[in-house]
């Protein structure tokens, strides 16, 4: 359960600010385009004068966009395909939940817990600080908290 005030704060303040700041940075270099996933997948593509702004704010936008996309008012179970991949990677769904909870609760300061697909096509749990997105490490996020 996440209370209404927390949701409003994250949507109307945090996410809106990340998006505005990412757009402001991109306006300084229209030649690089606006595909944040592409840019963050290799941050050397981003001009140095806006690199950290895009890592922070572009990452914050992508992180929150995925978070909103995955929210649902009702409890949902993973599909058979996802459950099989989780069991292959973690042994059981309970072991996955333990690993994900540990990633979320042991992050010092601000950050995210992730279920990602790594470069080998396998699922893994990881944590990133602040608004860093796993895309910058060559991993595709599929669940973030």
Curated annotation (Swiss-Prot):
Binding residue positions for Mn(2+): 10, 64
Sorted UniProt keywords: Iron, Manganese, Metal-binding, Oxidoreductase
Residues reported in the UniProt entry to bind Fe(3+): 10, 64
Enzyme class at the top of the EC tree: oxidoreductase
Any one GO molecular function term: superoxide dismutase activity
Entry note: cofactor: Binds 1 Mn(2+) or Fe(3+) ion per subunit.
Cofactor(s), names only, from the UniProt record: Mn(2+); Fe(3+)
Catalysed reactions listed for this entry: 2 superoxide + 2 H(+) = H2O2 + O2
Protein name: Superoxide dismutase [Mn/Fe]
Species assigned in the record: Streptococcus alactolyticus
Gene responsible for this protein: sodA
